[in-house]
A protein has these predicted regions:
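A polyampholytic, Gly/Pro-enriched intrinsically disordered region
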Residues: 1-9, 103-107, 132-135, 330-344
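Gly/Ser/Thr-rich active-site cleft segment
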Residues: 2-117, 183, 226-230, 258, ...
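ATP-dependent carbohydrate kinase catalytic cores
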Residues: 59-167, 178, 194, 200-214, ...
């Protein structure tokens, strides 16, 4: 499947639970649909799913590029209860239902096109269609996407791999649950004064935090943070891991804690990039930054300095929506190919280059050693 494990979060496990605990509901259900599948059904009356999203369910096989027959059989789920699979960016055979068309005000010749899972659509919107280019999304979580032409599904590191928007292309996706959420927690817990100031000045509080972090020298006064407030996933999985501030002294101020939060996410990014390069035996030459964290120039600079790799900011901040639009444009004939559509994303990138090589090397090594030392204690 490309997934590191089969657990209770997966739709496959949830279907098994419904079958075993709500047998009457299971028996009466003709099709089980994900939310996106349901929207396609309501629009057209057709049961349809697309492959990138299906690859996140536990019932899709990356080896066969279709339903995982052995897994469905072992789970006792007949394929007939699932929708037909389509490529992302496919014009569905079924047309818009007349009542839907009337309610939404669409023309009779409006086409319905399958989209893609958020991370794969975002990678497309950022131009991430070739090996060596990586997207990182610092939202609530940190998601790192690397396009691959070949995926080692037996790799012992068990990094998540999804189907990409193109046949024969995969998206390896290391995932860390608290990145922007770490900063939000810090803001909510310790930055009441900054929140009041931002409200009075009609500014985003995150702009104020960026300014405070930028005024604080690299290294955060020797303070290190581990950003694992809800557990770690990659490169070392430990659901019991928790956040840590290490190295507090009498001269440690609020701005040092804040800077350590920014730097810890950059360290986490570098650690997972090194995992990607180790697993795939290929260099990473550029990082394209997405999500709310991409708006922070100081955070992009810290990431570039920590990793030693240029970090790019797309002119179009909503890369996921742009990727979905690219799929529709190719499907409707507006663009000849996804590669052609993605060229626009290539041109519209502002780059932040590494400055001060080696500035963070000692701190990064201490960060890695700190987690290795504390991991057995969580």
């Amino acid at each position: 499947t490309g997934l590191p494990e089969l657990n209770g979060f997966l739709p496959l496990a949830k279907l098994m639970w419904i079958r075993e605990n709500e047998p009457e509901i299971y028996r009466q259900t003709e099709k089980f649909l994900l939310l996106e599948d349901y929207l396609l059904y309501r629009l057209t009356g057709q049961f349809a799913a697309e492959k990138t999203l299906a690859s996140s369910t536990g019932w899709f096989s990356l080896r066969t590029d279709g339903y995982w027959q052995e897994g469905l059989a072992a789970a006792g789920i007949p394929q007939e209860k699932l929708p037909e699979l389509f490529e992302p960016g496919t014009v569905l055979p079924a047309k818009l239902l007349p009542d839907v068309r009337e309610k939404l005000g669409f023309r009779a010749d409006t086409l319905v096109v399958t989209g893609a899972m958020d991370q794969t659509a975002g990678a497309l919107g950022a131009g991430n269609l070739r090996p060596g280019c990586v997207t990182e999304t610092t939202g609530t979580a940190l998601c790192i996407g690397a396009a691959l032409e070949k995926a080692d599904l037996d790799d012992p590191n068990r990094v998540t791999v999804y189907r990409h928007v193109k046949p024969g292309l995969f998206l390896m996706l290391p995932f860390c649950m608290t990145a922007g959420l770490f900063l939000k927690w810090f803001k909510d817990t310790f930055c009441e004064a900054e929140c009041r100031q931002a409200e009075q000045e009609h500014r985003s509080v995150y702009e104020l935090l960026d300014e405070l972090a930028e005024q604080t020298p690299p290294g955060a006064g020797g303070l290190l943070a581990l950003p694992y407030l809800t557990g770690s996933i990659q490169p070392c999985s430990n659901p019991n891991a928790r956040g840590v501030f290490f190295g507090i002294g009498l001269d440690t101020k609020k701005q040092h804690f804040l800077r350590a939060v920014y730097e810890s996410v950059a360290f986490m990014l570098r650690e997972n990039l090194e995992l990607l390069m180790r697993v795939n035996h290929m260099p990473v030459t550029q990082i394209r930054s997405l999500g709310g964290g991409a708006k922070s120039a100081v955070w992009r600079q810290i990431k570039a300095d920590v990793t030693g790799i240029p970090v790019g900011l797309a002119a179009q901040s909503e890369s996921t929506s742009l990727g979905a639009a690219m799929l529709a444009a190719v499907a409707c004939g507006g663009k000849a190919s996804l590669e052609q559509a993605a060229q626009a994303a290539d041109r519209a990138v502002v780059w932040t280059k590494p400055d001060g090589a080696g500035r963070y090397e000692q701190a990064y090594q201490k960060y890695c050693e700190l987690f290795r030392t504390l991991n057995p204690l969580f």
